[in-house]
UniProtKB/Swiss-Prot annotation:
SUPFAM superfamilies: CinA-like (SSF142433), Molybdenum cofactor biosynthesis proteins (SSF53218). Transmembrane segments: none annotated. The lineage of its organism: Bacteria, Pseudomonadati, Thermodesulfobacteriota, Desulfovibrionia, Desulfovibrionales. CDD domains: cinA. Pfam families: CinA, CinA_KH, MoCF_biosynth. This is CinA-like protein. It comes from the Bacteria. Disulfide bonds: none annotated. Belongs to the CinA family. Signal peptide: none annotated.
Amino acid sequence: MRAEIISVGTELLLGHTINTDAAHVGRALSALGMDLLQVHTVGDNAGRLEAALREALNCADVVITTGGLGPTDDDMTKETVARVLGAPLEEHKDSLRRLREYFGSRPIAANQLKQAWLPRGSTAFPNRAGTAPGCAVPGKPGQWVILLPGPPSELLPMLEDSVMPFLQRMGGAVIASFMVRTFGIGEGSAALRIADLTEGANPTVAPYASDAEMFVRVTAKAENAEAAEALAKPVVDAVRGRLGDVVYGVNVSGLEAVVVEQLRQHRRSLAIAESCTGGLLAKRITDQPGASEVFGYGLITYANEAKTRLLGVPEEQLACYGAVSPQVARSMAVGVRERYGADYGLGITGVAGPGGGTEEKPVGLVYVALSCSNAVWLRVLRPQGRYLGREWTRRLASSHALDMLRRHMAGLPVEAGWADGLPQD
């Protein structure tokens, strides 16, 4: 099935709000094996929305709109869809009941009540996080327009609870989708290794990059879940085999989830000392369920005095080599492990930017160290080409720290480099 997305909102068009809705919907469509043709963004203008909708209906089996379902005058998506499809708005009794339950004893303004009116023939999607229901409106045979609310906190539950099951039923097939997640290989190298696998129609294999990682989604369709999984799993195994030990998991939420689970299984503990990452690594760890079992201490030692007092980094080492140096990174990793009684210590120091760099130590240079009782490992992240920003540098450094620990606990070489000219030892 072919799909298009129309994102509605002047705030999106002008860049005042980042359009995360399109990314969420696009990922959902990909998981269902649908072919996403285009993403349109239109302002709060009925004429332009109508033009975009008519254009999309000429090409797609499913058109998904996001935004414009609220109670204000500039929320006009339903009215426009109703006009284009010739499906006048009608009061939807169940949606009205839910709206009244939401407000309880509070009075409901007249403009709020319009949220309970849906195009004739709609399949309603309840909104468990807000007031505006979504809906699917039939167009010509085999064609649907799906209307979703704009706030991600409302859109995401509706996607999961209602829209994806609805599209699966309309597609007449059960979908099995597997996400192979990697760290340590670029999209170009990965694509070359699995090029022949991406040519298949069922399962489909789609690589893409995000946040310094590379993912491969394998999606299969069949009459039932068991048959779909049976189609997908040999291809998943082939992808894993081609990519090797840069694969850190399938259908896992991230490196941090894998590392926390490894620590729990090995009954090991972790302490962290951060400088340029400012606590991001500790946050990623503590976001995971069960982190309290394996993670006891996370220190942000930004100042040299803090590195010495809290971690035992020698003053003469800081004076001789500077805070951004392999020597200090190693001392941070060893110090945090020894002083706070952990099995593993991670230390990060660098120049996250945008200022503070020198010719000798440019912006983007980061040292990441891992310490255990009998060894210390180091990775050096050197800027490659243009500087990609402070947040990118911090995220990349924290991912390298997690990957070093993952690889050690999996019995893999810790100091393995990166492909595609990305940061390496």
